[in-house]
């Protein structure tokens, strides 16, 4: 038999078409590939302004604060606003930020609960705590109450001094047993290096508290802050804000409206 002659040009063409077809099929299976220079750029994180731009603002449904009709002294106004916050269902409306300062640590702040109000504002804590030590060095403090839903704030400045011992003892005995145990177990703000040892100290303190209902640490202190200045702030729908400041003058108070 004679040898079969194959057209080389035709064979090369068929081979080329087959390779292109196989390559195309491979691309379809692997998915489209985006060239590196046209890949989408990673989106940058939003700026702080972008994060808060859409945040809700106060729309208070409360009586407008007017200097002429405001009380002659600030405590009654504070109590009225506190009652409004309680009626509105504000969580812990008696919570406030206590600001203190010392030479070593500078200014610091933390949230506490108000214990009572008469002519002074009362709170309790250990005199050996950081805030207690700061007050011992500089008795000047500031208390800031903020009720966001009502668009209201009250800032009290004055001096914190230790009140009668019986007030501190009564407060401590009315605290939850677990809270009393925490105060007895370890000095406040002590660093915890050993969780197991801390738990054991807390268990011992619980046993002490259960055994003696009258147990009150010597360092537990009721502080009273006689206000020297009280500034009240209220957001309104018609204006950005209204501010009134009360300054103590002897046994009286001077009121002034402040520019926002």
Regions found by a protein language model. Name each.
Residues 2-260:
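Binding-site signature for planar aromatic cofactors or substrates
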């Amino acid at each position: 038999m004679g040898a079969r002659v194959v057209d080389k040009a035709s064979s090369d063409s068929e081979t080329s078409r087959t390779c292109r077809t196989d390559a195309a099929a491979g691309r379809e299976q692997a998915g489209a590939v985006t060239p590196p220079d046209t890949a989408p750029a990673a989106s940058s994180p939003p700026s702080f302004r972008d994060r808060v731009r859409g945040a809700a603002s106060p729309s208070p449904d409360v009586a407008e604060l007017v200097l002429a009709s405001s009380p002659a002294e600030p405590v009654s106004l504070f109590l009225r606003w506190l009652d409004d916050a309680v009626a509105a269902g504000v969580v812990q409306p008696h919570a406030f930020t206590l600001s203190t300062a010392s030479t070593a640590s500078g200014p610091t702040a933390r949230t506490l609960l108000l214990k009572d109000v008469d002519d002074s504002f009362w709170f309790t804590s250990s005199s050996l705590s950081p805030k207690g030590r700061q007050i011992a060095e500089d008795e000047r403090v500031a208390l800031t109450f903020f009720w966001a839903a009502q668009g209201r704030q009250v800032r009290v400045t004055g001096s914190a001094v230790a009140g009668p011992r019986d007030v501190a003892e009564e407060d401590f005995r009315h605290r939850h047993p677990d809270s009393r145990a925490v105060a007895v177990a370890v000095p406040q703000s002590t660093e915890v290096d050993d969780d197991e040892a801390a738990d054991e100290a807390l268990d011992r303190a619980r046993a002490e508290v259960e055994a003696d209902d009258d147990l009150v640490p010597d360092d537990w202190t009721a502080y009273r802050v006689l206000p020297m200045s009280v500034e009240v702030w209220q957001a309104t729908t018609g204006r950005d804000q209204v501010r009134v400041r009360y300054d103590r003058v002897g046994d009286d108070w001077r009121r002034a409206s402040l520019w926002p």
